Amino acid sequence: MDVFMKGLSKAKEGVVAAAEKTKQGVAEAAGKTKEGVLYVGSKTKEGVVHGVATVAEKTKEQVTNVGGAVVTGVTAVAQKTVEGAGSIAAATGFIKKDQLGKNEEGAPQEGILQDMPVDPDNEAYEMPSEEGYQDYEPEA
């Protein structure tokens, strides 16, 4: 029985030593894991901040580009609409065809929207002067 007890004692010492080594190993591994997670987190944060700043800058550039294209497109559509309305008015007899597209002096009339200054980088747009408008008086 003495041999049995001695064997159990040695086994116990071995288990304690293994547990101690395991505890030390786990603590060391946990420390390294924490360092790794913090490092990855800090690099990810830097990357996210840089990425967000880059995306914000690119978005601003694209909005400026798209804004200019939209203003130009809207101006072109509006001009075509005015021209189309003039053609319809002439076709239906509201105005004479020889008056279509001419001002009071008989010169070709520029589109009202073409006289409007368009600056896509500037948020304030000026309205065209009242001189660009003509009063419409239907023929009776």
UniProtKB/Swiss-Prot annotation:
Nucleotidyltransferase among keywords: no
PTM-bearing positions, type Phosphoserine: 87, 129
BP GO terms, sorted: chemical synaptic transmission; regulation of dopamine secretion; synapse organization; synaptic vesicle endocytosis
PTM sites of type N-acetylmethionine: 1
Modified residues (Phosphotyrosine): 125
Residue numbers spanned by region Disordered: 100-140
InterPro entries per UniProt: Synuclein, Synuclein_alpha
Subcellular location: Cytoplasm; Membrane; Nucleus; Synapse
Bias kind Acidic residues: ranges: 118-140
Pfam annotation, one family: Synuclein
GO (cellular component) term, any one: axon terminus
GO molecular function, one term: copper ion binding
Keywords: Acetylation, Cell projection, Copper, Cytoplasm, Membrane, Metal-binding, Nucleus, Phosphoprotein, Repeat, Secreted, Synapse, Ubl conjugation
Residues covered by region (Interaction with SERF1A): 111-140
Protein residues bound to Cu cation: 2, 50
PTM annotation: Phosphorylated, predominantly on serine residues. Phosphorylated on Tyr-125 upon osmotic stress. Ubiquitinated. The predominant conjugate is the diubiquitinated form.
Keyword Cytoplasm: yes
Record text on subunit structure and interactions: Soluble monomer. Homotetramer. A dynamic intracellular population of tetramers and monomers coexists normally and the tetramer plays an essential role in maintaining homeostasis. Interacts with UCHL1. Interacts with phospholipase D and histones. Interacts (via N-terminus) with synphilin-1/SNCAIP; this interaction promotes formation of SNCA inclusions in the cytoplasm. Interacts with CALM1. Interacts with STXBP1; this interaction controls SNCA self-replicating aggregation. Interacts with SNARE components VAMP2 and SNAP25; these interactions allows SNARE complex assembly and integrity.
Similarity comment: Belongs to the synuclein family.
Function of the protein: Neuronal protein that plays several roles in synaptic activity such as regulation of synaptic vesicle trafficking and subsequent neurotransmitter release. Participates as a monomer in synaptic vesicle exocytosis by enhancing vesicle priming, fusion and dilation of exocytotic fusion pores. Mechanistically, acts by increasing local Ca(2+) release from microdomains which is essential for the enhancement of ATP-induced exocytosis.
Record's protein name: Alpha-synuclein
Organism: Macaca mulatta
Gene for this chain: SNCA
